Design a protein with these regions (language model features):
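Short, positionally conserved secondary-structure boundary motifs
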Residues: 1-48, 74, 81, 116-121
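Short coil-to-beta-strand transition motifs
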Residues: 70-74, 108-109
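Glycine- and charge-enriched low-complexity intrinsically disordered segments
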Residues: 82-121
Length: 121
C-alpha cells in the first residue's frame, strides 16, 4: 500500500500526496493509502509519527476518525455531523473542536476513514 504523505494531528497542514514508500498492512483492513501523522491532537490513540491506514470513502459515521480536507489543508479528527454543522473533534482534550457551519461546508471533503494504525515502522 502506498504511503502518500503526512497528515496533521493538530492544526491542519497543507495536503500533499506523493508516494513516499510502500508498506505492508493486513489485507483485512482494506486500506487504500497510508499517511504519517504529525502532532498530538489524537493522542493517546494516535501518536506523533504513527502511520494511519485510510480507506477512501466520501462519508463516515459520526464518531469515526477521518482524514478530512479543509480547502488545501488536511487533518485527522473524529467526525461529527448534526444538521448543517460539522465538528472535527480531537482525542486530546487540550485541543478545541473545529466547527464548520452551513456556509463553510463546501470547504470540507472527507478523504476516507482510518482503518488501521501502524506504530514503530
Amino acid at each position: 500500500m502506498p504511503l502518500v504523505g503526512s497528515i496533521a494531528c493538530g492544526t491542519p497542514i497543507l495536503a500533499e500526496q506523493n508516494i513516499e514508500a510502500r508498506i505492508g498492512v493486513p489485507a483485512l483492513w482494506q486500506a487504500d493509502f497510508a499517511l504519517t501523522c504529525h502532532g498530538n491532537s489524537m493522542a493517546a490513540m494516535i501518536q506523533d509519527g504513527d502511520i494511519v491506514c485510510i480507506r477512501k470513502q466520501p462519508e463516515v459515521e459520526n464518531g469515526e476518525i477521518a482524514a478530512v480536507r479543509i480547502g488545501e489543508e488536511a487533518t485527522l479528527k473524529r467526525f461529527y455531523r448534526q444538521g448543517d454543522t460539522v465538528m472535527l473533534q480531537a482525542e486530546n482534550p487540550a485541543f478545541s473542536p473545529l466547527v464548520y457551519t452551513r456556509d463553510q461546508l463546501n470547504e470540507i471533503t472527507i478523504e476516507g476513514r482510518v482503518v488501521g494504525i501502524c506504530r514503530g515502522i
